[in-house]
Each structure stands twice: as structure tokens, then as C-alpha cells.
A protein has these predicted regions:
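Conserved, mostly hydrophobic/aromatic
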Residues: 7, 29, 77, 86, ...
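Residues at secondary-structure transition points
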Residues: 20, 68, 96-100, 125, ...
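Active-site gating/metal-coordination segments in enzymes
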Residues: 36, 44-117, 165, 169
Length: 237
């Protein structure tokens, strides 16, 4: 199974006592059996430098729509083929995902046919139903619910329900602890809308991979969840 990791961070994170610098990324990907890694950091320049040094790493532009230069900077980054969408973290950056200043970011992504990976699973700004307001406004957008609700069963069920209501929503598995919910998600919305991510280096990729592998997926479903789905969404393959 060729693995595409849809959710990875690069940089120094002293609060968590973890780090993954550009010099260690290639080895980290190889050691964890990851063929393609989608990486991000609020320091987009660091990500750009990294993806141009590591062939099998690709960037997601960290979009903070409260930044007045966000949209123009996003266009600049998406002109670079090494950038394949955006990461948004409304909880960390402090905004509701359907604020009017978010809309221009989504409209740029629609122009490019690229997705937004949005952190999903914590109040007050990243509950699945809050993100659903944005999804409903832009049914042509491609929205990934990062962590598919994270660690709370109510939010996990909510994320699966939102995806079942909206064909433009994908689920990403990192940090969500229950293998059984990955199987449920595939059964409810299909293997073409569920994708593996690790949240490395905060989480161990091999542990996150095992969680998916133990979900009881059919071999064909496992191939899609571990890489095929993300490849199509980010690269059109």
C-alpha cells in the first residue's frame, strides 16, 4: 500500500517538545513508509523552503484569513505546484469558519480546484456543525475535516454525519482514536472520501497507520484510505 499522509507539521514545537525540521523530513517520511507527505506550518516560507528540498513533500498554505494579506499571499503560493491546498485552524487563529473574511479564501480554492484541510473537533470554532455552515455556503468547495472530530464521540459522529450530508466533504483520520469509526465512515460515505493522516510529529505515524489497518477495511478500501483518496484530491491522480 502506497501511503500518502494528508496531515503533517514541520518545524519546532516547544510546547509539545517535538520537532521535525527540513533536514530530518526526508528520513522521517522514509522511516514511516510515507510515499508522499502533505506538510504545513504557520510559517509558510519555511514550508516553501522545505518542499523544494524534499521531493516527496508538498505544502498546504496555512491560511489565517484574519491576515489582510492572506488572499494575495495564497494566490502567490498556489502558483507554485508544490502547494496543493490550504490548512485552516479556526481554533488556533480565533475565528468562526463561516466568517465573511473566510469566503475569499474558499473562492480562491474553488478557482484552483484544491481543498481546504480544516481542523475539526474542538469548541468553540472547530465543531463539525460550525464547519458545515461554510460547507453549505460553498457546495462546490472541497473541504476536509481534519481529525474527523478528534477525540470526542459526539464530534466524531457529527463529522461523519456532516460528510454524509455533503458530497464535498472528506474525513481525515489523524488523532481520532477509534478504528471502528473509520470503518463506519467508509461504509457510510465511501472509500473515496476518507483519508489517512498522522498529525506527525505530534502523533506517531506508525501508530496512526496501525489504527487504520486494524479498522477491518477490505483490502481495496485500505488502499484508497491510506493513499489513493488523498492522491486524487490533492493531485487529481
Amino acid at each position: 500500500v502506497e501511503i500518502t499522509d494528508a496531515h503533517m507539521h514541520v518545524g519546532e514545537f516547544p510546547l509539545f517538545d517535538v520537532r521535525l525540521d527540513k533536514n530530518g523530513l526526508a528520513g522521517y517520511l522514509a522511516d514511516n513508509g510515507i510515499a508522499t507527505g502533505m506538510i504545513f506550518n504557520p510559517d509558510n516560507a519555511l514550508v516553501r523552503e522545505t518542499v523544494h528540498e524534499v521531493d516527496n513533500a508538498f505544502g498546504l498554505y496555512w491560511a489565517n484569513p484574519k491576515n489582510p494579506d492572506c488572499v494575495s499571499e495564497l494566490r502567490d503560493y498556489l502558483a507554485d505546484p508544490k502547494f496543493r491546498g490550504v490548512k485552516m485552524h479556526p481554533l488556533l487563529d480565533g475565528y468562526h469558519p463561516d466568517e465573511p473574511f473566510v469566503w475569499p479564501v474558499i473562492e480562491v480554492l474553488i478557482e484552483h480546484g484544491l481543498p481546504a484541510l480544516i481542523h475539526c473537533g474542538h469548541p468553540i470554532f472547530t465543531l463539525p456543525w460550525s464547519i458545515e455552515e461554510l460547507v453549505t455556503r460553498y457546495e462546490e468547495a472541497r473541504i476536509i475535516l481534519g481529525h474527523m472530530g478528534h477525540g470526542n464521540i459526539v464530534y466524531i459522529d457529527g463529522a461523519i454525519a456532516v460528510a454524509s450530508r455533503h458530497p464535498n466533504v472528506w474525513l481525515e483520520t489523524s488523532g481520532m482514536p477509534m478504528s471502528s469509526k473509520i470503518l463506519e465512515a467508509v461504509r457510510r460515505i465511501g472509500n473515496d472520501r476518507v483519508m489517512y493522516g498522522s498529525d506527525g510529529p505530534f502523533h506517531q505515524p506508525k501508530v496512526e497507520q496501525l489504527k487504520v489497518q486494524l479498522a477491518g477495511l477490505d483490502p481495496a478500501d485500505l488502499v484508497e484510505v491510506m493513499g489513493g483518496t488523498a492522491q486524487r484530491l490533492f493531485f487529481g491522480d
